[in-house]
Amino acid sequence: MQPFLRALQSLGALLVLFAGMTGAARALDLSQAVILVASSSLAGSIYEQTVILAAPLPQGGHVGFIVNRPTSVKLETLFPEQAAARNVAAPVYVGGPVLSRAVFAVMRKAPDNSADFVSLMPGLVAAVDGSTVDRVIEKSPNDARYFVGLMLWAPDELDDEIRNGAWEVRPADADTVLRANPSGLWKSLEGEIV
């Protein structure tokens, strides 16, 4: 019976190892948008307990938005001249430290199917220039989540951060990105097995 138990334990260990390798290989497939969940190695940093949508850029690298950092600032504070901004009850989010004075809008689809939007993934687009954000505010202000700043990675930089254990990688989906109440989002995703 002992040899059988040892063989069974070895098989179990191999299955666990194989599952870990499969997860690691999948985690490093960054050719599609992913959700990044801050690992415990980021404790004490500005990225502690962050959840980020990261999407590949055509020329390499990635762009992203922190999706669980709402501010106390309302859109009307940033756009007092736009009456439609007063109707947006949701707060503006901190999207990241890059271009921290710029406002971006992320939504499920571009209003009027405009080409002035960047596709982040199927079902999510971003308005990244001021005139396009203005149009979103005027035409469909409550259909977007607004971010101040964004995340930006050079080619291979995000791969390196993941390999060094900074981020856990999850499949991206629009519902996670646009979740109405992001408090508790990190906790619900951290350590989740995918």
Predicted feature descriptions by range:
Residues 1-5:
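N-terminal secretory signal peptides that target proteins for export/translocation
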Residues 8-21:
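Bacterial N-terminal signal peptides
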Residues 26-194:
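A short aromatic-anchored loop/beta-hairpin motif
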